[in-house]
Swiss-Prot record:
InterPro entries assigned: ATP-PRT_HisG_long (IPR020621), ATP_PRibTrfase_cat (IPR013820), ATP_PRibTrfase_CS (IPR018198), ATP_PRibTrfase_HisG (IPR001348), HisG_C (IPR013115), N-reg_PII-like_a/b (IPR011322), N-reg_PII/ATP_PRibTrfase_C (IPR015867)
GO terms assigned for molecular function: ATP binding; ATP phosphoribosyltransferase activity; magnesium ion binding
Disulfide topology: none
Catalysed transformations (reactions): 1-(5-phospho-beta-D-ribosyl)-ATP + diphosphate = 5-phospho-alpha-D-ribose 1-diphosphate + ATP
Location(s), subcellular: Cytoplasm
Description of activity control: Feedback inhibited by histidine.
Organism name: Halorubrum lacusprofundi (strain ATCC 49239 / DSM 5036 / JCM 8891 / ACAM 34)
Main location: cytoplasm
Protein known as: ATP phosphoribosyltransferase
Residues making up the signal peptide according to the UniProt record: none
GO biological process, one term: L-histidine biosynthetic process
EC assignment: 2.4.2.17
Record-level GO cellular component terms: cytoplasm
Keywords: Amino-acid biosynthesis, ATP-binding, Cytoplasm, Glycosyltransferase, Histidine biosynthesis, Magnesium, Metal-binding, Nucleotide-binding, Transferase
Length: 296
C-alpha cells in the first residue's frame, strides 16, 4: 500500500510525526524526496505537493492520501462513505486533527459588499475556483470567478475583484489588507482520504486504526498508583477512568493493610486536580505518563 503525503510546507512535519507515532517509521532510501519505505514492508510513502495528492489517489498512484480537505474538495468530489461516493470521489476516512483553517468570502471593509447577496453580478478572485463556484451555487448568487495563483487578498484593491475566497487561520492577513469576512465557505483540516475501492482493504483499515489510536491518546494521560483497599471506592470516585480503572491486588503495606494498584486513563486537563484528590483519599506512589497510542 502506498500513502501519499505532503512533501513540504506546513503539513509536512506534522504528517511525518503522525506516521512515526502510528508505528510507520520511514526508512531512508536513495531517492528520499520522492518516496520512502516504512518498517512495514507492505506500506510505502509517496511525497507529493499537497494540492496534487488527491489526483495521485484518484489515479491510483497512491492508495490513500493525507492532505487538506480544501485541496481534496477543490480537485473533485469528497464523500463520507464508499456507498455515498461517485466514481471520481474520494472518501474522507478520518480527520487527523491538524492543519485547521477556513476558506472564507471576504471583501473590503469600506466597500459596498456586507452580505453575500451584495456580490450578485460582481467578481470573486480565488485560488479555489471549483469550491467557490460550488459555494456561489449553494447561496444562489450569480458572480464571476477569477482564478489567481497568489496574493489573492490584493485583488480587490487593484480593481481586479469585488471580493475574494481565500484561506485564513487567524484572520491577521485579512485585517492587514483591510478585508472583512462576509461568510464562511469551508472548514478545512488535514484528512486521510482513500478511493472508494480501497475503503475495505485490510491494510488501509490497519493504517486507519493506527492513526485513530494516536488521536485517541492525544490529550490523555496514564495514571498509576497504590491505594488502601478499604478506600478503593473513594479512589474510583476520583478517577472513573476510560471505562473504569484497572485494579490489581499488591502486597500489604508495612502495617499489614491491604493495598491495591490502580491504573486509569484520564484527561490531561484533569491531572492537576486529580492528583490532589487522590492524595486526599490515601493514594501513594502516583505516576503520570504519556500515552503514545490508545486502541479502543
Amino acid at each position: 500500500m502506498r500513502i501519499a503525503v505532503p512533501n513540504k510546507g506546513r503539513l509536512h512535519d506534522p504528517t511525518l510525526s503522525l506516521l512515526e507515532r502510528a508505528g510507520l517509521h520511514t526508512e531512508e532510501t536513495a531517492d528520499r524526496q520522492l518516496y520512502a519505505d516504512t518498517v512495514d514492508p507492505d506500506v510505502s510513502i509517496l511525497f507529493a505537493r499537497a494540492a496534487d495528492i488527491p489526483e495521485y489517489v484518484r489515479d491510483g498512484a497512491a492508495d490513500v492520501g493525507i492532505t487538506g480537505l480544501d485541496q481534496a474538495a477543490e480537485s473533485g468530489g469528497v464523500a463520507d462513505s464508499a456507498s455515498a461516493a461517485g466514481d471520481d470521489d474520494l472518501v474522507d476516512l478520518l480527520d487527523l486533527g491538524y492543519g485547521s483553517c477556513k476558506l472564507v468570502l471576504a471583501a473590503p471593509e469600506d466597500g459596498d459588499i456586507s452580505v453575500v447577496a451584495d456580490l450578485a453580478g460582481g467578481t470573486v478572485a480565488t485560488e479555489f475556483p471549483n469550491i467557490t463556484r460550488d459555494y456561489l451555487d449553494r447561496v444562489d448568487v450569480d458572480a464571476d470567478v477569477v482564478t489567481v495563483t497568489g496574493a489573492t487578498e490584493l485583488t480587490p484593491h487593484v480593481d481586479m475583484a469585488d471580493a475574494i475566497v481565500d484561506i485564513t487561520s487567524t484572520g491577521t492577513t485579512l485585517k492587514v489588507n483591510r478585508l472583512a469576512v462576509i461568510d464562511d465557505v469551508l472548514d478545512s483540516s488535514v484528512r486521510l482520504f482513500a478511493r472508494p475501492d480501497m475503503v475495505d482493504d485490510a491494510k488501509v483499515k490497519q493504517v486507519l486504526t493506527a492513526f485513530e489510536s494516536v488521536l485517541a491518546a492525544d490529550g490523555r494521560r496514564y495514571l498509576m498508583m497504590n491505594a488502601p483497599k478499604e478506600r478503593l471506592d473513594e479512589v474510583k470516585d476520583v478517577i472513573p477512568g476510560l471505562g473504569g480503572p484497572t485494579v490489581m491486588d499488591v502486597e500489604a503495606d508495612e502495617n499489614g493493610n491491604g493495598m491495591v494498584a490502580v491504573h486509569a486513563v484520564v484527561e490531561e486537563r484533569d491531572v492537576f486536580a486529580t492528583i490532589s484528590e487522590l492524595k486526599s483519599v490515601g493514594a501513594t506512589g502516583i505516576l503520570v505518563t504519556k500515552i503514545e497510542r490508545l486502541v479502543g
